Amino acid sequence: RVDYSLARLAHYTATDPVHFQNHILFTNYGFYMDEFVNFALDALKDTNSGYTSFVASGNHITTLENLVLTKTNKQPQMPTYHLTRADGSGITLVNIGVGPSNAKTATDHIAVMRPHAWLMLGHCAGLRNSQSLGDYVLAHAYLREDSVLDEDLPVWIPVPALAEIQITLEDAVAQITKLKGYALKKIMRTGTVASVDNRNWELREHTGPVQRLSQSRAIALDMESATIAANGFRFRVPYGTLLCVSDKPLHGELKLPGMASEFYRTQVTSHLKIGIKAMEALREMPLERLHSRKLRSFDETAFL
C-alpha cells in the first residue's frame, strides 16, 4: 500500500515523495501556485526563516546558493511545490485540479506519509445573499454530496471540526487582514460547506439542490473540501478548510471572465498568506495537541 502510493505521488506530482513536507496545502488554481513561488523565493532569502530549499515539479531544486528557478516544460496532472525545512516541517502546496475524484486521489496517497495537517484553500459559491465576493468561509461542518468516499466512509458518519485547526485559521485571517471583532466576522463566516460532484449543479432545476442546501444551513458550495476533510478524518490527518467566495449563483452573481480575473488578482495573495500563516502556527503546536483525540476511535491506541 505504501509503495503503491509513493509511486502514484511521483507520477501525479512529478516530484519524489521524499520532498513532501509535514504540512500540506491543497488548491485547484494555478494563481496560488504562482504566488507560492514568490513567497518561497523570498523565504529562502530570509536566513532566519528556517526554509532550506524550494522543490518544483520535475524535482528542480532551488536554494539560497542557487536562486535560479527552473520549471519543467511539461506540467504533471497535479503540479506540486515544496518549501522545505531540514526536519520536514516545511509546506507542500498541491494543485489537485477540479473535482472530488482528484481530491480523493491526492489525499489517499499523501496520507501514507502521515502529515501533521492538511488544509484546503479554494474558491466556493457563496449561498447567502449577505456574503460578498472575496469573503472567507471557515468550514465547521460538511454536506457530503461528492459521492467518492461513500463506501469508505458512509455519509452518516459526522466529520467534526477540529478546534486546533479552526482557531488557528481564524487567528491567521485576523493577522493577515488586520481585522477583529465584528469587522472580522463580516468578512469570514463559519458554517457548513456543501461539496458536490456536479460542476454544473446550478444548471439543474433548483428545487432539489436548493432544498437540501437550505435544510443543511450550508453557506458555501464547492467540489473538493468535504472529500479532503472526510479523508483526513478517515486517515487521522488533522484537516481544515478556508474558502474564498468567488461567485453567488443563487443570487445572480456569476463567475464571468472579467469579474473573475479582477477577483483573482486582488484575493489570491492574501488567501495564500493566511494558509501559510496557519501552517506556520500549526508547526509550533505540540504534536500531542495537534493530532486531535477526535480522530481516534474509543478502542484505538493514541499515536502520532
Task: Identify what each model region corresponds to.
Residues 63-304:
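Glycine-rich phosphate- or other oxyanion-binding loops that anchor nucleotides, phosphorylated ligands
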Residues 1-98:
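N-terminal short beta-loop-beta anion/metal-coordinating cradle
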